[in-house]
């Protein structure tokens, strides 16, 4: 139902944030 959709969206957002954080860390370490 609606709740599982909201939960899935939250999971996807968390995963995207994690991936973005990893990419940012990689870019910073490469720049250094």
Swiss-Prot record:
Keyword Aminoacyl-tRNA synthetase: no
InterPro entries: Dermaseptin_dom
Main location: secreted
Keywords: Amphibian defense peptide, Antibiotic, Antimicrobial, Chemotaxis, Immunity, Innate immunity, Membrane, Secreted, Target cell membrane, Target membrane
Pfam families named among the record's database cross-references: DD_K
GO (cellular component) term, any one: membrane
Compartments where located: Secreted; Target cell membrane
Iron is among the record's keywords: no
Expression sites (tissue/organ): Expressed by the skin glands.
GO biological process, one term: innate immune response
Task performed by this protein: Antimicrobial peptide with activity against Gram-negative bacteria, but not against Gram-positive bacteria. Active against E.coli (MIC=5 uM), and P.aeruginosa (MIC=40 uM). Acts by disrupting cell membranes. Is able to depolarize membranes of Gram-positive and Gram-negative bacteria. Also acts as a potent chemoattractant for human leukocytes and activates them mainly through a GPCR, possibly FPRL1 coupled to the ERK1/2 MAPK pathway. Is unstructured in water but become helical upon binding to anionic lipids.
Annotated family: Belongs to the frog skin active peptide (FSAP) family. Dermaseptin subfamily.
The name this protein goes by in its record: Dermaseptin-DA4
Source species of the chain: Agalychnis dacnicolor (Giant Mexican leaf frog)
